[in-house]
Amino acid sequence: MKPFTQHTGLVCPLDRVNVDTDQIIPKQFLKSIKRTGFGPNLFDEWRYLDAGQPGQDNSKRPINSDFVLNLPRYRGASVLLARDNFGCGSSREHAAWALDEYGFRTVIAPSFADIFFNNSFKNGLLPLVLNKVEVDALFAQCQVTEGYTLTVDLAAQQVITPDGTTYAFQIDTFRKHCLLNGLDDIGLTLQYAEAIRAFEATHRIRQPWLFAPLR
């Protein structure tokens, strides 16, 4: 998992409440359990005018020119600004995978659905909570300022605007450690690889019958 320390990126404002996981990545694209291949179909039903299917050439599909991600001013955005209850609906880790693969490093919102919130941390995507007044202020600035960027400093737990305004945010200490060091569940386990090998060697000596071949 790629570490998250400090990130400065173009902001895309998604001004909708209760964005659910089926809207983030529609169900027909969930047949794969690989973590890749979902970015091109992020918000598929909003980005395109036709019904998307796995394996389609998206370059030949009619786009919804009014959807915010398709507006030229937001191309290349890596900070998603959202509204309340982002990521609600069914539990699908694919939603975090799709956002990450598209290029988003963080989603800023007043609140998140619990399962999406947890899945994001496990996949290197920072779900960042600010209060509604702060999010409203960011929406207002983003919508009137083309090329609006934000800096997210995870170590300092601050969001920094282009004019130097800062917004503090809270994050669990353990989750912060994992993001700063790029540690997913596998990475955390591998930190103890030597201790695990030592235990297995000792365990084999102390209880050899557990490792005897079956007859």
From Swiss-Prot:
Keywords: Amino-acid biosynthesis, Branched-chain amino acid biosynthesis, Leucine biosynthesis, Lyase. It catalyses: (2R,3S)-3-isopropylmalate = (2S)-2-isopropylmalate. GO terms for biological process: L-leucine biosynthetic process. It holds the Pfam family Aconitase_C. Its EC number is 4.2.1.33. Belongs to the LeuD family. LeuD type 1 subfamily. This is 3-isopropylmalate dehydratase small subunit. The lineage of its organism: Bacteria, Pseudomonadati, Pseudomonadota, Gammaproteobacteria, Lysobacterales.
